[in-house]
């Protein structure tokens, strides 16, 4: 079974390895590229913990994080924790249920002023009593020029993997622009919200 992976690198390769290990035949066609933004202008001295929800954030803010080694880092997901480990940065805790649950863990550890390093397209900032969260945008996912083989790759694959709502919206737009029938395209998404973003079809 062929699955089309459209997420940006290096995440696309990591996703492809997981699907290949599960017996699928991954086809890579990234429709986005990660762009690192300037490091946060805030001082880490005002925070008692840092939250990351993406390996992209870890890579984009490497210098900033290296200057903040005394501050515990909380990571959402094993991929984020792995990216931090690859950069030789310690992880205080790794969560698997999203940023709100992880903020709750940090709060239980006594941290009440958190800095969330995130991408431009991020979920809502959690609202937890007694916890103040500032967010710093350290990267963005920029749409690439539509590949010439877009329609052909979509047609030959059995399913398209969508990792984010933005990717779902962009993919649906490209399908419509290319005259592809949505009803003939199977989608595999990481949440109901992402599926809804892809629209009807």
Residue ranges and their predicted role:
Residues 1-201:
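Signature of uroporphyrinogen-III synthase
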């Amino acid at each position: 079974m062929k699955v089309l992976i459209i997420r940006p690198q290096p995440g696309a390769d990591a996703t492809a390895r997981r699907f290949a290990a599960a017996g699928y035949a991954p086809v890579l066609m990234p429709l986005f590229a990660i762009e690192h933004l300037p490091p946060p202008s805030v001082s880490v001295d005002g925070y008692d913990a840092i939250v990351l929800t993406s390996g992209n954030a870890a890579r984009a803010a490497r210098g900033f994080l290296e200057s903040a080694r005394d501050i515990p880092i909380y990571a959402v997901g094993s991929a984020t924790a792995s990216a931090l480990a690859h950069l030789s940065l310690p992880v205080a805790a790794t969560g698997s249920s999203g940023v709100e649950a992880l903020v709750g863990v940090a709060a239980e550890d006594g941290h009440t002023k958190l800095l969330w390093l995130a991408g431009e397209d991020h979920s809502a900032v959690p609202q937890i009593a007694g916890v103040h969260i500032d967010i710093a945008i350290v990267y963005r996912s920029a749409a690439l020029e539509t590949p010439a083989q877009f329609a052909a790759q979509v047609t030959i694959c059995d399913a398209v993997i969508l990792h984010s709502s933005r990717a779902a919206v962009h993919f649906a737009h490209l399908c419509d622009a290319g005259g592809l029938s949505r009803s003939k395209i199977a989608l595999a998404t990481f949440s109901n919200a992402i599926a809804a973003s892809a629209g009807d079809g």
